Amino acid sequence: MNAKLIGLTVWLTLASTAVMSQGFAGLGQTAEGYAVPTPEPSFSFPADHGPHPDFRVEWWYLTAVLEGEDGETYGVQWTLFRSALRPEGDVQVWMGHAGVTTPDEHFTGERLARGEIGQAGVTSQPFAAWIDDWSMQSRAVEGDPLDALQLRASLDQAAYTLDLNANGPLVFHGDKGFSIKSNSGQASYYYSQPFYEVKGLLRLPKGDVEVKGQGWLDREWSSQPLDADQFGWDWFSLSFEGGNRLMGFGLRDVSGMSFTYASWVTLDGEVTSSNDLRLTPLRTAQVAGRDVPVDWRIELPSQGLDITTSALNDESWQATLFPYWEGPVTASGTHEGQGYLEMTGY
């Protein structure tokens, strides 16, 4: 029995139908018994870079848009998810996702593990996150541990080793890191490091490619981040010429886009929160037998933003246990830039 099958067997044994009913960790289920985010959070670093086992779900989520020495654009994803299967926090499971996107190909990897045996985990000081041989590890000799990272992952047909250096501060979404996700008040704790300069090496079927570009790390944890009626989301992280950044998302229910939010981030890390974000699908593509909106119009009137985003590769489908679309995009219009789009529930 191979390692992935063993991991999947463990996962399905530990994860009840209820937990899996709304995607990873049952994101829309009641949080009864688990810790819940509260307004006016007080973060403590580096401790809060580490896990919070009394919350149901948590992730360390990095994406990067890279330019190769061959002139091509590439995208990279590295994600580690943690889920507590009981409120006591004594039964944890971990899931890792990695992706490499080129204009013509998309490579996906997935790892599954249970906690407490060393196969996967996160430490806050020194900072390290890992599952099997995939790792995100601090290289910082002073300051915040996330200021400098090394990232590694190996997939069936691709691999990467990347060094990341932050040239800006951590930023906090919502109200100082308390990020509301619905009109009913479901929320998460959510902060990011959106200012990474990235360089390193991709290993692809065509050969090794040296790359450099920009990266974005999201840190988020909660116990019920979605309303029970919400079944999908569309999430953007964009970096614009001139240095401003945008994090924006829309959450969907049967009536359509039910809740939106945006963080407008200046070059010095100042965040302006807004709920006037408008997301409009412009073009759909048949991906994995589904109609997926791969080009979007994004409007944020409070910042004079009106842009169109276009996918680098329509086929950026993560065919994982809980499948979704994740890939690099370019932005044009009132602002020019690039970034990442994640879509679930299609």
Predicted features and spans:
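Bacterial N-terminal signal peptides that target proteins for export
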Residues: 1-8
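N-terminal signal peptide c-region/cleavage motif recognized by signal peptidases
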Residues: 15-18
